[in-house]
From Swiss-Prot:
GO terms for biological process: antifungal humoral response; antimicrobial humoral immune response mediated by antimicrobial peptide; ATP biosynthetic process; calcium ion homeostasis; gene expression; glucose metabolic process; insulin secretion; mitochondrion organization. It holds the Pfam family ILEI. Keywords: Disulfide bond, Lectin, Secreted, Signal. The gene is Fam3a. It comes from Mus musculus (Mouse). Belongs to the FAM3 family. This is Protein FAM3A.
Length: 230
């Protein structure tokens, strides 16, 4: 009975020694245990190779714009539920989060030289006064960039003068806009040719994505800055 105590101590020492040896073998010695564990948990049998994320540039563009160009992305509203977005040089000019969009036409005026936002407003083209829109776009200065995104209905209140002014800004489709069409457009005061930055989706019960509305439009690209001389 007197040997029971010493035997227990010897047994405990042996167990501790064996445990230390086992841990050393498994973990590879001091300082390398964590990498060994990580290698086990990330072995081919236990790991899934993650796809590398594609790099995004200003406004989420897949490629950077050249020097002296402005990066932009415009998304029209979806039906009468999701508001439009206008992004320029990684700055959100208009969106539901900024609480500055509304039914109708959402328009941001930008200095074509500096890229600075001049003014942003929404114009109700269903129940609003079209004269408010005319007062906004008639006095534009040469070289001003005009970003437009529709939401719900862009055209019911449009008159001949409104369509003509947008056409003079470079639009091909302003003359044909109708009730609940989707429209995104970038034009400029003083352009000689039609803008390459425009999309138009007709409201048609045969092709509408939503009940009573066409699908939302999304457009992105690079706009050359205007020279100071115009």
């Amino acid at each position: 009975m007197r040997l029971a105590g010493p035997l227990r101590i010897v047994a405990l020492i042996i167990i501790m020694g064996l445990t230390w040896i086992l841990v050393t073998i498994l973990l590879g010695g001091p300082g390398v245990g964590l990498p060994r564990i990580q290698q086990f948990f990330t072995s081919p049998e236990n790991s899934v190779t993650a796809e590398p994320r594609a790099r995004k540039y200003k406004c989420g563009l897949p490629q950077p714009c050249p020097e002296e160009h402005l990066s932009f992305r415009i998304v029209s509203g979806a039906a009468n539920v999701i508001g439009p977005k206008i992004c320029l040089e990684d700055k959100m000019l208009m969106s539901s989060v900024k609480d500055n969009v509304g039914r109708g036409l959402n328009i941001a005026l930008v200095n074509g030289v500096s890229g600075e936002l001049l003014e942003a407003r929404a114009f109700d083209m269903w129940a609003g006064d079209v004269n408010d829109l005319l007062k906004f776009i008639r006095p534009l200065h040469e070289g001003t960039l005009v970003f437009v995104a529709s939401y719900d209905d862009p055209a019911t209140k449009m008159n001949e003068e409104t369509r003509k002014l947008f056409s003079e800004l470079g639009s091909r489709n302003a003359k044909d806009l109708a009730f609940r069409d989707s429209w995104v457009f970038v034009g400029a005061k003083g352009v000689q040719n039609k803008s390459p930055f425009e999309q138009h989706m007709k409201n048609s019960k045969h092709t509408n994505k939503y009940e009573g509305w066409p699908e939302a439009l999304e457009m992105e690209g690079c706009i050359p800055r205007r020279s100071i001389a115009g």
